[in-house]
């Protein structure tokens, strides 16, 4: 078993992608860094390229062991779902290009792991992230969701170890 593990949680979006780095060492979770990427560029393809570059910079800077990525949920319309799926593909590609394994989690699974219900509001998730990490949540909602994904994954890893499955 590794002495510590570092996970990047990512909440993909075409307008804003939240990310958060959480490290677990000896059962203690620590916030390393977090932020939000607002891609720049004239057209959608340029924004996707900027998202890739910015996220790749984060991955290179923090060298996470694994990535927990929020899966695409149902969007209000097909065009929105397609754009979200493309942004998510860019996120997965940026991680894979740097050798970081990607684990997907449905939003309801992440919410249930942090709040106890899969229908929790973003504010509730952000509050619980702050409680778990022992910090005051002063980040964007997308960043809180990304940190929640990282915490959810670290909890899943711990449960797998305790069950003797890893």
UniProtKB/Swiss-Prot annotation:
InterPro entries named among the record's database cross-references: RNaseH-like_sf, RNaseH_sf, X-over_junc_endoDNase_RuvC
Predominant location: cytoplasm
Disulfide bonds: none
Gene Ontology biological-process annotations: DNA recombination; DNA repair
Keyword Amino-acid biosynthesis included in the entry's annotation: no
Reaction equations catalysed: Endonucleolytic cleavage at a junction such as a reciprocal single-stranded crossover between two homologous DNA duplexes (Holliday junction)
GO cellular component, one term: Holliday junction resolvase complex
Binding-site residues, Mg(2+) 2: 70
Cofactor annotation: Mg(2+)
Co-factor remark: Binds 2 Mg(2+) ion per subunit.
HAMAP family assigned: RuvC (MF_00034)
Oligomer status and interactors: Homodimer which binds Holliday junction (HJ) DNA. The HJ becomes 2-fold symmetrical on binding to RuvC with unstacked arms; it has a different conformation from HJ DNA in complex with RuvA. In the full resolvosome a probable DNA-RuvA(4)-RuvB(12)-RuvC(2) complex forms which resolves the HJ.
NCBIfam families linked: ruvC
Protein name: Crossover junction endodeoxyribonuclease RuvC
Biological source species: Nitratidesulfovibrio vulgaris (strain ATCC 29579 / DSM 644 / CCUG 34227 / NCIMB 8303 / VKM B-1760 / Hildenborough)
């Amino acid at each position: 078993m590794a002495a510590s593990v570092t996970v990047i949680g990512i909440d993909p979006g075409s307008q804003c992608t939240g990310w958060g780095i959480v490290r677990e060492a000896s059962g203690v979770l620590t916030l390393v860094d977090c932020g939000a990427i607002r891609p720049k560029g004239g057209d959608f393809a340029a924004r996707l390229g900027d998202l890739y570059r910015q996220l790749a910079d984060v991955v290179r800077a923090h060298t996470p062991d694994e990535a927990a990525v929020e899966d695409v949920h149902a969007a209000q319309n097909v065009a929105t779902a397609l754009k979200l799926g493309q942004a998510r593909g860019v996120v997965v590609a940026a991680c894979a290009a740097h050798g970081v394994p990607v684990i997907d989690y449905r939003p309801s699974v992440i919410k249930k792991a942090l709040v106890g219900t899969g229908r929790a509001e973003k504010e509730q998730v952000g509050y619980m992230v702050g409680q778990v990490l022992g910090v005051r949540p002063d980040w964007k909602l997308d960043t809180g969701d990304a940190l929640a994904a990282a915490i959810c994954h670290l909890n899943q890893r711990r449960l797998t170890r305790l069950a003797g499955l890893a």
